Amino acid sequence: MKYASFIAAAAAALASAVSAAGVSGSAEGFAKGVTGGGSATPVYPSTTDELVSYLGDSEARVIILTKTFDFTNTEGTETSSGCAPWGTASGCQLAINKDNWCTNYEPNAPTVSSITYNKAGVLGITVNSNKSIVGQGSAGVIKGRGLRIVSGAKNVIIQNIAITDINPKYVWGGDAITLNEADLVWIDHVTTARIARQHIVLGTQADNRVTISNSLIDGRTDYSATCNGHHYWGVYLDGSNDMVTMMGNYFYYTSGRMPKVQGNTLLHAVNNYFHNIEGHAFEIGSGGYVLAEGNAFQNVDAPVESPISGQLFSAPDATTNEQCKSVFGRACQINAFGSSGSFSQADTAVISKFSGKNIATAHLAQNIPKWVMANAGQGKL
């Protein structure tokens, strides 16, 4: 009887541990309602092949990462020609001549006869629908390869992991997280660092409902397109019918595209911390509709690049911000600045685009730097 009781107690404890493993909290903003793998029994991959299999199959899954999955050498290397469009100094990125990019777009750039890079990084791991990818503590790392949520995949959660070291010297060597024709995606408490090109990119097809929250885009790098140790290729939102909430993120030590917004993208940027950006943060092209409130900018050369071809409501002052009440049910929050450039444009037509949609909460910008630095990124759930 004692043995039976022990077994029952052990089984109960195991069941409790399993049920506790998985996603923490819930998404705010446009990805509200995302469930990922839901209540599926967690799986714990132990090899890179097993991780790829779990991410790409058709089952609803909660995938717990407990270690570093290093893809750097899993597919060997490739050698090709390239170019140096941003300079030949040791701190400048080089570009792989992928799809004849150098030939077609940078014909006058110095040529590089031989570039050797890791093949695995160029194309991310396919993530199918109904997946939760969750790191355990600070242990869950995907190194040398990114993730791709594309071609109709939906209902995906990526939480508490790091994606690092994807051919950082070479543009076109790979992106950390790619979405293209996806829906209901929540990226939360994710750290990205030392990436070839985009840390997060939403391609030209529609990515309907996306929330990027509490994440760290770490731009510190030995190789940069601006040759200054600040990564240029940050977040690129270019979809044909995209709704993106960015909240509580830490954008650090970058020099551009933080984010670049165009195509037909509605962006709510709220309570983010932009810090030590030698260059520009926002870049708003045609079809980019941005409402930015309650953000903090510290040592940011240009919070937004000029000219603005899309529309921006920058929550410029208390009186103007009252106009948010008709849609948000509250006034918008003023942004905060320290040793930063100007950020003031009031395209109030942007406000009405949020009507009937899930809108994230907003807090005072003055409190954001301390809060974000304590909470954004992997290991800070």
Curated annotation (Swiss-Prot):
The GO molecular function terms of this record are:
pectate lyase activity; pectin lyase activity
InterPro entries documented for this protein: Pec_lyase (IPR002022), Pectin_lyas_fold (IPR012334), Pectin_lyase_fold/virulence (IPR011050), PEL (IPR045032)
Where would one find the signal peptide in this protein? 1-20
Enzyme Commission number, as recorded: 4.2.2.10
Q: Glycosylated where?
A: N130
In its UniProt entry, what is this protein called?
Pectin lyase 1
Please give the superkingdom of this protein's source: Eukaryota
Q: List the cysteine pairs that form cystine.
A: C83-C102, C92-C227, C324-C332
Q: Does the keyword Disulfide bond apply?
A: yes
Keyword check for Nucleotidyltransferase, yes or no.
Answer: no
Q: What does this protein do?
A: Pectinolytic enzymes consist of four classes of enzymes: pectin lyase, polygalacturonase, pectin methylesterase and rhamnogalacturonase. Among pectinolytic enzymes, pectin lyase is the most important in depolymerization of pectin, since it cleaves internal glycosidic bonds of highly methylated pectins.
Annotated GO biological processes are:
cell wall organization; pectin catabolic process
Keywords noted in UniProt: Carbohydrate metabolism, Cell wall biogenesis/degradation, Disulfide bond, Glycoprotein, Lyase, Polysaccharide degradation, Secreted, Signal
- Give the family this protein belongs to, as stated in its UniProt record: Belongs to the polysaccharide lyase 1 family.
